[in-house]
Amino acid sequence: MAVTYEQARELVRAHFEPNWTMGTFCLDDRWIRENDEFYVFNIGAREFIIDGDDSYAVIGSVPIVLKEEGRVASRPSAMIATDPSIRNAPNPNPTFTPA
């Protein structure tokens, strides 16, 4: 059964947050990024996402959740950045709080 965006977001949080060691875990969900196969999530250290501290930047893969399977996976960030099938829409109910 396909997962909703909200279910996918919680899967990502449950997968990454408990063992996060680089700064304070942050899932920036102000935008919903997706294509027909998966949701894309922006996670990282709050110190980088909010404060702009480059020493907390993480380079490499981007977490995704496969819609049909509900499985957390990853894709290279360059692949995600250049994938024309990925759509971006403002999230009407973000959990992200910048303050």
Question: Where do the model's predicted regions map?
Answer:
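Short, non-transmembrane alpha-helical segments in secretory-pathway proteins
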Residues: 1-27
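Short, solvent-exposed cationic patches
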Residues: 88-99
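Residue-level marker of positions within ordered structural domains that often coincide
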Residues: 17, 46, 75
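A short, surface-exposed interaction/processing loop segment used at functional sites
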Residues: 59-89
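Helix-coil modules at protein/domain termini and other flexible surface or pore-lining loops
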Residues: 17, 68, 97-99
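Exposed beta-strand-loop-beta-strand "reactive/processing" segments of non-cytosolic proteins
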Residues: 26-67
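N-terminal targeting sequences that direct proteins away from the cytosol to non-cytosolic compartments
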Residues: 2, 76-79, 99
